[in-house]
């Protein structure tokens, strides 16, 4: 019923993954496996819902459909065992935009934001772009290649100017589903130090290999009272171009400060198609989601097997969530420039450079495996050939 092996020609769609190759890398002959969207068709139950609305020829001002908030509430309850109330939820115009909004509402220009690199680069760029200092609490790499939070260092780098900690849960690029114990410990620290937590949970519905996502706000009363959770169906159902993000804020005091500000600036009003796509995804998407995740798991196994047999100098870290694979290339013993030259000019691949994710990302590349296996095989063959010439 669902064909994830089908290769889709994305030309003519103005997609970023292909369209930005020339301005970003100076060449457009690269196989793009960088931008975190899928090369799979957006499922038909979403496109059918959008087409049905398009058949009505009037596109004036609209209200949220009646089932918009209930569809979110039911999905979060069924998948994450978290009971969310209607008044906790508001549409936001994108998760990165939401981070910028929170930074502006809850901090002054002389205050600081804590992030834990290597991590999704807008966590640094957005606060810095808004004139806030970003403080690093780098994750610690364990012997197995996975990461853990460094709570001792967190205590050291904290000062009273720190007002927000941005959490990536699940973690990008490491693909980590943080344990309940880790999240509780983080909540205890942030509560005691009066830190507001923004929990980016855009990959929440993409847990893999038996792992489970745990919403930060669900782990304790402390977590619930200091956090804003940002979620979206965009990654899971490949609708990033339809802005469909939302905030979940259990604490009334935080809501009273943030939501009226959103409303005053009309930033909590979803575009026409966002609720339609969200409802379709959350009401009809479970079978597709499971099959998609199974395909992603097989793609990850394919990368692992291929690297082990043909490119042993590159060690993929198996993600516990998401379709992003963190490639450890340090055994190649290449400088940063030489590593980029290997992937771009020799293998003709466009991946995300590990250094863009901050301290700890050196010697890594991020690979998007949400693509037909034939494309993934081609990419690995090109990489194998390039590495063999080192």
PLM-predicted stretches and their roles:
Residues 139-211:
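Active-site phosphate-binding strand-loop segment of PLP-dependent enzymes
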Residues 155-156, 223, 333-335, 342-351, ...:
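PLP-dependent enzyme catalytic core of the Aspartate aminotransferase-like
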Residues 2-96, 101, 281-282, 389-390:
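N-terminal small-domain helix-loop-helix segment of the aminotransferase-like
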Residues 279, 295-304, 316-329:
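Conserved glycine-rich beta-strand-loop-beta hairpin in the small C-terminal domain of fold type I
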Residues 48, 52, 221, 225-297, ...:
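Conserved core segment of the aminotransferase class I/II
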Residues 111, 132, 192-195, 224-225:
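A short helix->loop->beta-strand "cap" motif at the edges of active sites that frequently abuts
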Residues 105-127:
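Conserved PLP-anchoring active-site segment centered on the Schiff-base-forming lysine
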């Amino acid at each position: 019923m669902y064909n994830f092996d089908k290769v889709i020609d994305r030309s003519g769609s103005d997609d970023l993954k292909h369209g930005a190759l020339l301005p970003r890398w100076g060449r457009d002959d690269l196989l793009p496996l960088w931008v975190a969207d899928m090369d799979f068709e957006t499922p038909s139950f979403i496109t059918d819902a959008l087409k049905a609305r398009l058949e009505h020829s009037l596109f004036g001002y609209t209200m949220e459909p009646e089932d918009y908030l209930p569809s979110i509430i039911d999905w979060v309850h069924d998948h994450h065992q978290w009971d969310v109330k209607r008044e906790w939820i508001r549409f936001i115009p994108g998760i990165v935009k939401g981070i910028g909004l929170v930074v502006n509402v809850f901090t002054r220009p002389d205050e600081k934001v804590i992030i834990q690199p290597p991590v999704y680069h807008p966590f640094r760029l957005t606060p810095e772009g808004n004139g806030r200092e970003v403080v690093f609490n780098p994750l610690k790499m364990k012997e197995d290649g996975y990461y853990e939070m460094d709570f001792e260092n967190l205590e050291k780098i904290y000062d009273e100017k720190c007002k927000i900690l941005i959490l990536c849960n699940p973690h990008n690029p490491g693909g980590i589903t943080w344990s309940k114990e880790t999240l509780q410990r983080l909540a205890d620290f942030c509560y005691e130090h009066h830190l507001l937590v923004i929990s980016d949970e855009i990959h929440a519905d993409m847990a893999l290999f038996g792992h489970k996502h745990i919403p930060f706000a669900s782990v304790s009363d402390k977590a619930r009272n200091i956090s804003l959770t940002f979620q979206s169906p965009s990654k899971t159902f490949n609708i990033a171009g339809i802005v469909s993000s939302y905030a979940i804020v259990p604490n009334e005091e935080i809501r009273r400060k943030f939501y009226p500000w959103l409303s005053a600036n009309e930033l909590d009003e979803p575009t026409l198609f966002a609720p339609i796509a969200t409802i379709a995804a959350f009401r009809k998407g479970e079978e597709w989601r499971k099959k998609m995740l199974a395909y992603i798991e097989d793609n990850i196994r394919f990368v692992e097997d291929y690297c082990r047999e043909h490119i042993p100098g590159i060690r993929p870290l198996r993600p516990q969530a998401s379709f992003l694979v963190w490639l450890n290339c340090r055994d190649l013993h290449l400088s940063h420039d030489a590593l980029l030259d290997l992937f771009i000019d020799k293998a003709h691949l466009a991946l995300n450079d590990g250094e863009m994710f901050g301290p700890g990302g050196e010697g890594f590349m991020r690979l998007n495996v949400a693509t037909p296996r034939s494309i993934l095989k081609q990419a690995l063959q090109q990489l194998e050939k390039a590495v063999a010439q080192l």
